[in-house]
Amino acid sequence: MSRKGSTPQRTVLPDPKHGSETIARFINMVMQSGKKSVAEKIVYGAMDVIGEKNPNAIELVQKALDNVAPAVEVKSRRVGGATYQVPVEVRSSRRMALAMRWLIDSARKRGENTMPRKLAAELLDASESRGGAIKKREETHRMAEANKAFAHYRW
């Protein structure tokens, strides 16, 4: 383990189109193999599709992220010879990261024909508390609820 202390949190520059740090992080999460321009086209394309139905796309994205973000998750903890799934609260930075990851993964699994449409549909569903990302959050919360008895093993 390093003795130099923790590394400082990297700052993300706000995205050029909307000036939002959340959207910039979302673009970075969508990006694959360093292709940022492709990721920007996907996210901005999805926001344009959302913009046709809802004039305030940024608020809708924020609402979708808030709906998907988990409050608790389970972590494995070894005690004696047994491994317990211990429920722990999720810190805010990890909440947003998980919400973005789940939204993007669910969007990639959807059946629409282009990625911007898949992402837009998933964001619209998540803002109305339905869709694959919401299912993932509910499953995580169910796991934490089922293992509430092991909450005293927290670290």
Swiss-Prot record:
Presence of the UniProt keyword Repressor in the record: no
PROSITE patterns registered for this protein in UniProt: RIBOSOMAL_S7
Gene3D superfamilies linked: Ribosomal protein S7 domain
InterPro entries from the UniProt entry: Ribosomal_uS7, Ribosomal_uS7_bac/org-type, Ribosomal_uS7_CS, Ribosomal_uS7_dom, Ribosomal_uS7_dom_sf
Pfam families: Ribosomal_S7 (PF00177)
Gene Ontology BP terms: translation
Keywords tagged on the record: Ribonucleoprotein, Ribosomal protein, RNA-binding, rRNA-binding, tRNA-binding
Keyword Transmembrane assigned: no
MF terms in GO: rRNA binding; structural constituent of ribosome; tRNA binding
Cellular-component GO terms for this entry: small ribosomal subunit
Domain of life: Bacteria
Subunit structure: Part of the 30S ribosomal subunit. Contacts proteins S9 and S11.
Function: One of the primary rRNA binding proteins, it binds directly to 16S rRNA where it nucleates assembly of the head domain of the 30S subunit. Is located at the subunit interface close to the decoding center, probably blocks exit of the E-site tRNA.
Family designation: Belongs to the universal ribosomal protein uS7 family.
The protein's name in its UniProt record: Small ribosomal subunit protein uS7
